[in-house]
Amino acid sequence: MQTYVFDDHNVSWQTIEVIDAQIHVLAIDDDRGIVDVLIRFQPNIPGKLHQHLCEFSTLVLQGELQFQRPDGSLKEVRPTGSYVPGAANGEPHSEGAGDQMAIVLFSFRGATGDMIVYLDKTMDVSFRLGFSDFKAALAHQIATGASTKLGARAI
């Protein structure tokens, strides 16, 4: 199988420890509640259990995106080039990379409050990630000049 590498040398990644991944916000549309963000998953590190509260889509740019059920069993593997829309309030899951680092474009749609809830082992909410968190990440990118090469912006 051929390996494709996404050239991310112009991307300034922000580590979000609570989700065990790195992000770079590309654009935010306040009026429509849209957040477009690159998320980078390190190889073979399982993601945190969570549930999406809004509609979203994913496009795998590098590596593969692996999905696990709440019990840890493998649900699905999406290879490079996979585009999949997702519904709000779907099944809780975790996601992460396989043997190669994964870079995925996530487009979250139609929410200006909480967008993702992270769950503990008893399925209780342990952390919320919302529209304001992505806005803060974009503001940090702009303030530090991290967005200038890619032109990230709030609409």
Model-derived features: where do they sit?
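A short hydrophobic beta-strand segment most commonly corresponding to one strand
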Residues: 84-85, 99-116
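Conserved hydrophobic/aromatic beta-strand scaffold that supports enzyme active sites
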Residues: 23-25, 36-38, 57, 83-85, ...
